[in-house]
Design a protein with these regions (language model features):
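Single, function-defining residue in the core of a domain
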Residues: 1-47, 51, 80, 87-88, ...
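Extended Lys/Arg-rich, glycine-bearing segments that form polyanion-binding/interaction patches
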Residues: 92-93, 99-106
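Glycine-rich loop/turn
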Residues: 54-60, 169-170
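Short Lys/Arg-enriched helix C-cap and helix-to-coil transition segments
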Residues: 84-96
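Major-groove recognition helix of helix-turn-helix-like DNA-binding domains
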Residues: 61-80
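A short structural micro-motif
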Residues: 55-58, 95, 299
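Juxtamembrane membrane-interface segments at transmembrane alpha-helix termini
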Residues: 59-62, 350-352
């Protein structure tokens, strides 16, 4: 917890009135309890209460003024504005993005910022989470994430019910001129893509089939690389042509490994076609991010049923993930993010400095990776 920006956090709490009228379990203590649950894989409020009570003599050193009761923690998760935790996560994300500025996971040399945009669905029980409708028989929330591919740090996260269509998230983004936004075809909306072009941003996505467009120009290609065609096109459809009245670049690419043929659309006319294909391939990194946090953090089983409690738990999980990434970078650790998480999970009650605890554990042999554990970009 020593790396949490507590001064900034105090301002956030004051802004949202988080500690107004609070006698026990301040917002800072609430975050410590929820982060403890993430680091040590606690599955319920009772689990948190019992685990902390078993170490009652060490609670003060962890920042707790008194024992944590599950009823008090439940009330806090239900009533305190979830935006406290989203704002804290935003502060941590800004810090982490600066630390990972030069750590690109792209397979190409590119000066531009590259983002991967996608969503992941977390299924819920409709009778318990009626505020998050998805299908007729079940509920769900969606985790919409814009991942900065320089270090796999989320630059934007939005939590919605399961019915929100992915394409609507494009309206929420603050577009960065010169940046690339890599998306699957679920985000294909020509009016919104044209807004990206007007904002000076670039996109790489896949075309839907069939696509009504006429060829304007064809560039020479080397089919041995997998590039079948590289064309500039204009949309023919009555409505689509009005929504996107400029040239689009359409690249037909055959993946030499899988044999699949993919059609990419982009508004960048100068990059080599193979680079565009490599950028789209990098979109898989956001899928790895979702798999990692679902496997290693507590966001599949919730400790409260209300919208506020669920968002509180998810945002605390995101903040914990980013904190671990910050620890790894600031201490210049060579271990994976999962290894750092393992070490922190067994040393949360230790009074030694965090850097000493991590360095001491890593000086020994790394714990063996289990076969079903994901390594996220060597994190």
């Amino acid at each position: 917890m020593e790396l949490v920006p507590w001064t900034s956090f105090a301002r956030i709490v004051r802004r949202h009135g988080g500690d107004v009228g609070v006698r026990t379990l301040s917002c800072a203590e609430q975050f410590r309890a929820m982060a403890f649950a993430q680091l040590t894989w606690r599955e319920s409020l009772r689990d948190i209460e019992v685990s902390l009570s078993a170490n009652a003599g060490k609670l003060y050193a962890m920042g707790f003024r008194s024992a944590v009761r599950r009823s008090t923690l439940a009330d806090a998760n239900e009533s305190r504005d979830w935006r406290i935790w989203s704002d804290l996560a935003a502060v941590l994300i800004r810090r982490a993005r600066k630390l990972y500025l030069g750590d690109s996971v792209l397979g190409v040399e590119l000066d531009n910022t590259v983002y991967a945009l996608d969503s992941s669905t977390i299924d819920l029980c409709l009778s318990l989470f009626s505020w998050a409708p998805f299908q007729s028989t079940k509920a769900a929330i969606k985790l919409h994430t814009l991942l900065d591919l320089r270090g796999a740090i989320p630059a934007f996260i939005h939590i919605s019910d399961g019915k929100l269509h992915d394409v609507n998230v494009l309206d929420m983004l603050v577009l960065e001129p010169g940046a690339f936004y890599v998306m699957d075809r679920g985000y294909l909306d020509f009016q919104r893509l044209h807004a990206m072009t007007q904002a000076g941003a670039f996109f790489v996505t896949r075309a839907k089939s069939p696509m009504d467009a006429r060829r304007v120009y064809s560039a020479p290609t080397d089919r041995s690389t997998g590039i079948i065609s590289d064309q500039q096109v204009m949309l023919n459809g009555h409505y689509s042509a009005k929504k996107y009245p400029q040239h689009l670049r359409r690249i037909r690419f055959k993946d030499l490994e899988s044999g699949k043929t993919l059609i990419f659309l982009t508004n960048h006319m100068a990059l080599p076609a193979l680079t565009i294909a490599a950028l789209y391939k990098s979109r898989w990194q956001v899928e790895l991010f979702f798999k990692w946090i679902k496997q290693h953090l507590r966001i599949k089983h919730f400790m409260g049923n209300s919208e506020n409690a669920v968002k509180t738990q998810v945002w605390c999980a995101v903040a914990t993930y980013v904190l671990i990434a910050i620890v790894k970078k600031e201490l210049q650790l060579d271990a994976s993010l999962y290894t750092c998480l393992q070490i922190l999970s067994v040393s949360v009650f230790e009074k030694t400095q965090l850097s000493c605890a991590l360095q001491a554990d890593l000086s020994r042999s790394d714990p063996p990776d289990l076969a079903n554990q994901l390594n996220l970009f060597n994190f």
